[in-house]
Design a protein with these regions (language model features):
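C-terminal region of N-terminal signal peptides and the immediate post-cleavage residues
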Residues: 17-34
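Glycine- and acidic/polar-rich repeat regions and solenoidal domains
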Residues: 246-268, 285-292, 296-297, 306-528
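Asp/Glu-centered strand-loop micro-motifs enriched in Gly/Pro and often flanked by an aromatic residue
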Residues: 60-63, 281, 419
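Surface-exposed extracellular loop regions of Gram-negative outer-membrane beta-barrel proteins
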Residues: 273-281
Length: 528
């Protein structure tokens, strides 16, 4: 959980530069008489956006919307992707409706091999080899092989339930799938994706499953990005956004969709952003929701659940309110969370290079995970963080939130002037962790059933420098922290009026440090 310069969230701002967008809005036509553009998944083609003749797709509505328009989305599933919004519009669910924006398609052409479902003999079914090819080496880890199958962002769902991806056709069962690709995207330098990628055609993969698709509804994720919200005063409200497969890296340029391959399922920037009452789930490898260069934004009453990697990221933003949201089941792919150096990012929410972020009244709940994360056996391998302030988060707060059975609840790292107050943490590896941060206030929290309730330690880095040469000169400056004069030293930490109870009891073989309710550890500024 160190040197996070290369993390997926920290590069969110880059999407503003190379983004290639296949859908662009055009000069608007006349708006419907009631001022609302209507969309219905069951509508016939050729609609005009009126209540009587709604559009059949969100893309059509976006194309014709004027700045200030409201797009009202009716019930149904909208299988669309790589949508770009560059005007101030509201996209909302119609009253009483539960629309789903899905990146998955339902293949209609399958070929069978072997036995049949339920016959007792193994059988597989394959799509044609014209499905979308996703990058399986585009991880924040420079060596994708270290991540195993987590590096593969592909997704298949049978009757709404996700299958587990496997590495060979021989491993396919009724609960797994395999992607057969004879010409996959590769790295220019084996074992180091930082050297770049060998770009391949957008399509060319075949999906293999172990159930008869004629007896089930089979969905295959075929889009990387759902939405890019790129203007001021955009509202997204009441939608379920699901089953997209963004990769973690931002710098793979697909020949058809360009930079939309990477980073996030939904990207949002601008002033006056409002994201409320949505569900973001089943994002393949990249973050479900990524916010960058946003100001005066509100993210409230959303569910970010069951995503392959990070739930939400915030970067280079200010005055962002994050309230009354729920996170659960994220990092379902199982990305590495321990000893991962520069690419550590796995969290429910990661905030970087930002100020005045208010995270309040939220819930992060892993009570259904089947693992007691206060046990040493969990902490040994799982360091996922519920809410993580990193690399220059300024004057922000984590308030009145509830964390249930999480590896790490709150982590404040190399930041300044932040408050962690009035939170309830029930079960954790570490409840509250502060590292290399100035003027952190830890007040009025309750931590129960944790391996360590509060941990405060000195980060070995200093003055916004991630690495130094043998002569002591900085060779890797973190520009935001350096510009804001951060020392990256743990000073002026205030721990006041907290309740710490029911600490996890050490067992045979545990070392002394795991029995402490509160740890305070010093270090030299020797690394960076």
């Amino acid at each position: 959980m160190r040197r996070s310069t290369a993390i997926v969230i920290a590069v969110l701002a880059l999407i503003m530069l190379p983004l290639t967008l296949p859908l662009t809005t055009s000069t608007a036509e006349a708006q419907p008489a009631d001022g609302v553009i209507h969309v219905s998944a069951s509508a016939a083609q050729g609609g005009d956006g009126s209540a009587d003749k709604p559009y059949a797709t969100i893309a059509e509505a976006l194309k014709d919307a004027q700045a200030g328009a409201t797009i009202e989305v009716g019930d149904g599933t909208y299988r669309e992707g790589e949508l770009s919004v560059d005007k101030s519009v509201t996209i909302r669910a119609a009253q009483g409706a539960a629309p789903v924006l899905s990146g998955a398609e339902v293949p209609t052409s399958w070929s069978a091999s072997g036995g049949s479902e339920g016959s007792g003999s193994a059988g597989t079914w394959s799509t044609s080899a014209d499905m979308v090819r996703f990058c399986t080496v585009c991880t924040t880890n420079a060596d994708p092989s270290a991540e195993g199958m987590a590096a593969h962002p592909e997704q298949v769902f049978v009757d709404g339930k996700p299958l587990t991806q496997v590495a060979s056709r021989a491993e396919v069962t009724d609960s797994t799938f395999y992607v057969d690709d004879n010409d996959p995207i590769t790295m220019k330098e084996p074992g180091n994706n930082r050297a770049g990628f060998n770009v391949k055609p957008h399509r060319g993969a075949s999906y293999v499953i172990g159930v008869d698709p004629s007896q089930h509804t089979v969905e295959v994720a075929q889009h990387s990005r759902a939405l890019s919200l790129l203007s001021d005063n955009i509202t997204l409200s009441g939608l379920t956004v699901e089953k997209y497969s963004p990769v973690q890296e931002w710098n793979y340029t697909d020949p058809e969709i360009g930079g939309n391959t990477g980073g996030v399922m939904v990207f949002a920037s601008g002033t006056g952003l409002n994201v409320t009452g949505n569900t973001f789930r089943y994002s393949g490898a990249g973050s479900a929701l990524g916010i960058a260069n946003a100001h005066d934004a509100t993210v409230s009453d959303n569910h970010l659940v069951d995503n392959g990697g990070v739930g939400m990221g915030i970067n280079r933003s200010s005055n962002v309110t994050v309230e009354n949201n729920l996170w659960s089941g994220n990092n379902s792919k199982g990305f590495i969370t321990k000893d991962c150096g520069a690419y550590c990012a796995m969290s429910d929410t990661k905030v970087t290079h930002s100020e005045n972020v208010r995270y309040a009244y939220n819930t992060v709940d892993y009570s259904q995970s089947g693992t007691d994360h206060s046990e040493l056996s969990s902490w040994t391998n799982n360091r996922q963080v519920a809410i993580w302030f990193d690399e220059g988060v300024l004057n922000s707060s984590v308030l009145a939130s509830h964390f249930v059975n999480v590896p790490t609840a709150v982590f404040v790292e190399v930041s300044k002037g932040n408050t962690v107050a009035s939170n309830l943490i029930e079960g954790a590896g570490v409840g509250i962790q502060v590292a290399g941060s100035e003027s952190t206030r830890v007040w009025n929290n309750t931590v129960t059933h944790a391996l360590t309730s509060i941990s405060v330690y000195e980060d070995e880095r200093s003055n916004g420098c991630n690495a130094r040469g043998s002569d002591g000169s900085c060779t890797l400056t973190e520009s935001w922290s350096a510009e804001h004069g951060l020392t990256w030293d743990t000073v002026d930490t205030s721990i006041y009026n907290n309740i710490l109870s029911s600490e996890q009891v050490p067992t045979d073989g545990d070392t002394w440090r795991y029995s402490a309710m509160v740890q305070v550890t010093g270090a030299k500024n020797a690394d960076g």
